[in-house]
Amino acid sequence: MKEMKTTAQVLVDCLEAEGVDVMFGIPGEETLDLMFAIRDSKIRFIPVRHEQGAAFMADVYGRLTGRAGVCLSTLGPGATNLVTGVADAYLDGAPLVAITGQVGTDRMQLTSHQYLDLTAMFEPITKRSKQIIRPDTVGEIVRLAFKHAEKGKPGATHIDLPQNIAKMPADAVPLKCQQMHEVYADPTHIAAAGKIISEAKNPVILAGAGAVRSHAAAAVTELADRLHIPVVNTMMAKGIIPMDDKYSLWTIGIPQKDYVNQLFDRADVVIAIGYDIVECTPAKWGARENMTIVHIDSAPADVNKRYQPAVEVVGDISESLYEILRCARRTGEPEFALALRQTMVAEHEAMAADDSCPMKPARILADVRKVMGRDDIVVSDVGTHKMWIARHYDCYEPNTCLISNGFASMGFSIPGAFAAKLLYPEKKVLAVCGDGGFMMNSQELETAVREHVPFVTLIWEDSSYGLIKWKEQEQFCGEHCYVDFSNPNFKLLAEAMRCKGYRVEKAEELIPTLEEAFKQDVPSVIVVPVDYSENMKLTEHLKQVYAQK
């Protein structure tokens, strides 16, 4: 008689049945049975240097594939280290399954070494958090974890595996992965949306991350081009319409009122496509009572007093947009939007022409854009550079500029770039971070060297937590406090981890340095001093723009 598999072995069988081909994590004493089951499977396990890095890797894997990325830790401090990355996936809508080891069930009712109630700890930051307490339920628990992570608005889920349960024989098998069928919108809602759009005087499309997750870029672009409607995207929806399309008015989301806010000030109808309030609140783009909102998404609208749609078109986003195109009619160009775009383009080109050093943010991004192909990938960390990337980095395809903007986690870029390059080895992948964010997960460069994943990291060096400094200066008459620090020699630090290290001292050096770095077969780190005096200049400039509108 064939020996029955253990719970750990069946769990790994379930992961394989879900299509898992890679996992990120750190082994621990309570996960030993699981580790050896993974060793005997077809799954590639990548040991990282901090569990947060594993969670961010799984997060970006999920964003780019639409399939849940999987991260693993042991109990106690290993699990608490996962929390930031898991929370990031939860709020940013990235499918992720976190698996944690746990003490045996006999120790759970007692004060015990490294024991925390992990199921309860993960509940507020996941769509579902469950512990396997009976071996015969492993198939159902794993299937439900992946189903919840990937269905509707994606997000994080959690599975907790006690040490003694992992060793027990399990009378269980993987459950069949059922294909999720698309839901189509109510035709009466389609017709109502088409009527509102046809009669609108100054409509604006607000495209959010849900449109990217639903692969609706082609439909959004066709809606804009055929009905002559300007498009503004959130940070996580950069590239949903090519930013060189004449109807693209780029990105909303920086703390200041920007040119694009003028569109919303004039708008009588906002067509919100895949819009997620967690990323950009209605107050930020200026929702008001006399504005008609059309909500188009795969999920109903969130409840918010400033976001009350006149009609909700809930179903497959692309199909909904194509159905609206069959019934909506508009003629004439949005002259104000087109003129505003010309002003924005001219200003961006002028800012990008500055060749002083320390380099200006707009110039750095213009040079990066010249080196990167249209489908190459930039992964932004969180900091001042994120605001400049949102405003000045041109994108032409979805998922070519990844930004954490729901949870907005520092330390996201290096693990994220690792996952992106792992998935797309043929593409250039660039992590862009500040010196603050770099130090939060720089250790994963060693992981990249060991696993032969050669992406490039671009550090904007200003020796401060620049975004907080900018906010302090805005709110406290130019003063700041507790945001400055010193840095190690990043070039030498990179070389110590067997990466290539570079430092740019002149503006004209950045492009050739980037080109050389992308030719390397190991990870590279480029340090570029940045002039963030541009931050307050931008603040004052935008105040003047709004005063004159």
Question: What do these predicted ranges mean?
Answer:
Residues 1-328, 367, 371-377, 454-457, ...:
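N-terminal alpha/beta PP-like core and its mobile active-site loop of ThDP/TPP-dependent enzymes
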Residues 2, 195, 289-386, 492, ...:
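Phosphate/pyrophosphate-binding active-site segments
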Residues 11, 16, 31-35, 342-420, ...:
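Active-site diphosphate/adenylate-binding microenvironment
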Residues 30, 53, 215, 359-360, ...:
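A generic structural signal for residues located within well-ordered alpha-helices
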Residues 61, 336-354, 420, 456-458, ...:
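Charged, low-complexity, helix-prone segments enriched in Lys/Glu/Asp/Gln
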Residues 99, 107-114, 303-306, 312-314, ...:
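Thiamine diphosphate
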Residues 183, 354, 358, 480-483:
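Short, surface-exposed loop/turn motifs that are enriched in glycine and acidic residues
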Residues 224, 253, 264, 361, ...:
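Active-site-proximal structural scaffolding
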